[in-house]
Amino acid sequence: MKPLLLLPLLGCLATIASCIDTVKWCVTSTKENLKCTALAAAAPVFSCVARASITDCLTAIKAGEADAITLDGGEIYTAGLDEYKLHPIIAEQYGTSTDTCYYAVAVAKKNTGFGLHQLMGKKSCHTGVGKSAGWNIPIGTLLSMDFIKWKGSDDKKLEEVVGEFFHSSCAPGATDSANLCKLCIGDCSKSSETEPYYNYHGAFQCLKDGKGDVAFVKHLTVPEEEKNDYELLCKDNTRKPIDQFENCDLAKVPSHAVVTRKDNEELAQFIWQSLSSVKNFNLFSSTPYGGKNLMFKDSTTTLVQLPLNVDHTMYLGPHYLESVKALKIVNIPSTTSDAMKWCAVGRSESDKCDSWSVASLVQDGTTIDCIKGNTVDDCLKKIMHKEADAMAVDGGQVYTAGKCGLVPAMVEQYDQGQCSAPGAARLYYAVAVIKKGSGVTWENLRNKRSCHTGIGRNAGWNIPMGLIYEQTKNCNFSAFFSSSCAPGADPSSQLCAQCAGNAESINKCKASNEERYYAYAGAFRCLAEGKGDVAFVKHSIVKENTDGQGPEWAKAFLSNDYELICPSKGPVSVENFMSCNLAKVNAHAVVTRPEIRTKVVTFLNNQQSHFGNSASEESFKMFTSPDGENLLFKYSTKCLQEIPAHLDYKGFLGQEYMTVMSSLRTCKESTSDLEQLCTYNMCQT
């Protein structure tokens, strides 16, 4: 999370194009407007904008007529669509833990004699159409369990199907089924307080008043003094007490969050600062205004700022998105695509992937769709969200992928002789390379210039910086070296000062092949071309890029001109990497989603039988790239081997490596925004 930056709220910086001095909060009811007006009186930085519904507020925020509103997960999904282009910036936190999730539950009165499997023909109370606990999760659950049968909107609108499933309902916001409004007592046409049975307290009141048989709410909705009169309906068709929600829920879902316009970091920061600076006003109490959950949920204990560049898909996570998308079927395809969606980073990888796709289609008709990502983290997000299926990454990126719910499926093997041995070790050594005679040692590295493969990568960052952190206990790595090239760092920092960009000197410090000094060969080139005093790479990289080997830029370099250094040893010959290295680490691995792991393994085994090093087909080689670059896979890869299905990322990386990473992750600068989000929002995994 971003720490609170205590900047003054008064006045405007000269660099700001348009002065932001007010947070215009959108409200959807008279009671909410009362609370907002009271907030504005206590903190004049706020003003209130009244609209008739949530969707009207989204339109107002997009147009700049309002700035912010707190939404539930289903509404966050809608807000993030192209129609509105809003994103979550602040999450509600409930209770004393750091958990920003809640449980969607089905509540019924005691002794009413039915379970979740017998809901057909019952009367239902919903918080609102499109809301998480009241609609998306319960309806998605009943669809997935095949109790509600729906072929998609080409057949019939979902609201019509749900209206036919239940005897009658109150589902505020329903427009396509009169039956879904039959139990309501106000204006059911809008998701707003104009309907008394709207939202959590309203849906529960609908049940309490005897209008409905079941209410779909969150786990904290039933008041403490009334819990003994109600029970939860579990997915296994049993019932449990209200307090046993962790063992009897429909789903764990992301908390409500404040949304605003995308691509306006300054506005997002101003909203956060404004909320953080509120004094003598309880943001999380609605009782004085005669309502419940006004502006924020009453059960909120604090607010948490989300990492920068988080969009609605990252915040909601793949499991919740799957539930929402299941409710929005427009066309039912007759068959599911068997294409493998491979994610490629940058133009060079995309070109190789396109060649692979053509070769595969010609060979046996297997379709490969090449999905382009800007960075590895961008590709990991695409895999999480089912926009891509797989990619090969280094160990540090396996760690991030694992934190985000992905699994390692296959690993690169660099020894041809071990390709027939399934349990063989797939390892390489992380080393520190210097120019011979430079006088650089491990002990005098401070204030030298450094070349790294990329932020978050194994040999180029995690291992060396982990060792440096163990020595210094200081996370300010940009101050340890005088200047560096560490692709993926802040382009304006000293960690990017030695980077060069591409041939046109653009994309400087980008974590892709568009940065000349990116990855193993790039970090060595940074050293060889005099941009750095030390390069952190893998043990084979010097031999692969000297003595006439490697791309054109490397032809004139000689391996004898370079040496290795390591703690308490060196300089030594580059041949002596086994006795002078920083660590022995796992090879690169292919990561994917758990549910398609077997599909990915089968696909890759088939592909390497056609295009691997030992295959006779010459039109395309999976592990070969122009000029010895590591495109899609490392150039030194001889084959891919399956990782046992029981091994998750922790088991694959090993305890020693996990310990190093835990230590390094003390430094937030070494943790990407993606990893911060994945470890922060545990609803995703």
From Swiss-Prot:
Q: Which residues bind Fe(3+) 1?
A: D72, Y102, Y200, H256
Q: Provide the GO MF annotations for this entry.
A: metal ion binding
Q: Which InterPro entries match?
A: Transferrin, Transferrin-like_dom, Transferrin_Fe_BS
Residues that bind Fe(3+) 2, according to the entry? D394, Y428, Y520, H588
Ranges where the Transferrin-like domain occurs: 23-329, 340-666
Gene Ontology CC terms: early endosome; extracellular space; plasma membrane; recycling endosome
Q: Could you say which residues bind hydrogencarbonate 1 here?
A: T127, K131, A133, G134
Q: What is its main location?
A: secreted
Q: Which family does it belong to?
A: Belongs to the transferrin family.
Provide the assembly information.
Monomer.
**UniProt function note:** Transferrins are iron binding transport proteins which can bind two Fe(3+) ions in association with the binding of an anion, usually bicarbonate.
| UniProt protein name | Serotransferrin
Q: Which organism is it from?
A: Paralichthys olivaceus (Bastard halibut)
